[in-house]
């Protein structure tokens, strides 16, 4: 059963929501324009506000549902977090798109909302605060990722815990996926949320 949960979580994460929206509404391949990501930000810049909101909600749901399914069928924390990371992996490296997907932010948020809604909401709050102040989605995502393990530590009260380790792994993964954004931020070349890349 555990193997089935993990495999199903990857397939769930692999659902190419942004790609399908781009194809259906504008007949464009998001992998070839803008940031090349199939996530909500690239949808916002190249398709529109409401399609981007739809993609964001679905992508959050992928991480959330994967963890909740695992929690329903098992009480093992390790399986819960593996299900979540499988959904994230599917989102980043979807089997249907040759391994070229999103950057894990929305699906990661969904995962942590399922593991601890307080930690998830705290991270979302940081994202929104930084976005409001700077208009940089990438900087907002990186800031939320950096603080995620800290929020998880305060929630748990300890470092030696499965949830803390997975929060650290996801944070590093999100930061790594934004490495080109970090370079552009340093050079002053990064696009703001209302600018096309």
Curated annotation (Swiss-Prot):
<feature type="transmembrane region" description="Helical">
    <location>
        <begin position="111"/>
        <end position="131"/>
    </location>
</feature>
<keyword id="KW-1003">Cell membrane</keyword>
<keyword id="KW-0444">Lipid biosynthesis</keyword>
<keyword id="KW-0808">Transferase</keyword>
<feature type="transmembrane region" description="Helical">
    <location>
        <begin position="159"/>
        <end position="176"/>
    </location>
</feature>
<comment type="similarity">
    <text>Belongs to the PlsY family.</text>
</comment>
<dbReference type="GO" id="GO:0005886">
    <property type="term" value="C:plasma membrane"/>
</dbReference>
<feature type="transmembrane region" description="Helical">
    <location>
        <begin position="1"/>
        <end position="21"/>
    </location>
</feature>
<comment type="function">
    <text>Catalyzes the transfer of an acyl group from acyl-phosphate (acyl-PO(4)) to glycerol-3-phosphate (G3P) to form lysophosphatidic acid (LPA). This enzyme utilizes acyl-phosphate as fatty acyl donor, but not acyl-CoA or acyl-ACP.</text>
</comment>
<keyword id="KW-0594">Phospholipid biosynthesis</keyword>
<keyword id="KW-0472">Membrane</keyword>
<dbReference type="Pfam" id="PF02660">
    <property type="entry name" value="G3P_acyltransf"/>
</dbReference>
<feature type="transmembrane region" description="Helical">
    <location>
        <begin position="136"/>
        <end position="155"/>
    </location>
</feature>
<keyword id="KW-1133">Transmembrane helix</keyword>
<comment type="subunit">
    <text>Probably interacts with PlsX.</text>
</comment>
<dbReference type="GO" id="GO:0043772">
    <property type="term" value="F:acyl-phosphate glycerol-3-phosphate acyltransferase activity"/>
</dbReference>
<comment type="pathway">
    <text>Lipid metabolism; phospholipid metabolism.</text>
</comment>
<dbReference type="InterPro" id="IPR003811">
    <property type="entry name" value="G3P_acylTferase_PlsY"/>
</dbReference>
<keyword id="KW-0812">Transmembrane</keyword>
<feature type="transmembrane region" description="Helical">
    <location>
        <begin position="78"/>
        <end position="98"/>
    </location>
</feature>
<protein>
    <recommendedName>
        <fullName>Glycerol-3-phosphate acyltransferase</fullName>
        <ecNumber>2.3.1.275</ecNumber>
    </recommendedName>
</protein>
<keyword id="KW-0997">Cell inner membrane</keyword>
<keyword id="KW-1208">Phospholipid metabolism</keyword>
<dbReference type="GO" id="GO:0008654">
    <property type="term" value="P:phospholipid biosynthetic process"/>
</dbReference>
<keyword id="KW-0443">Lipid metabolism</keyword>
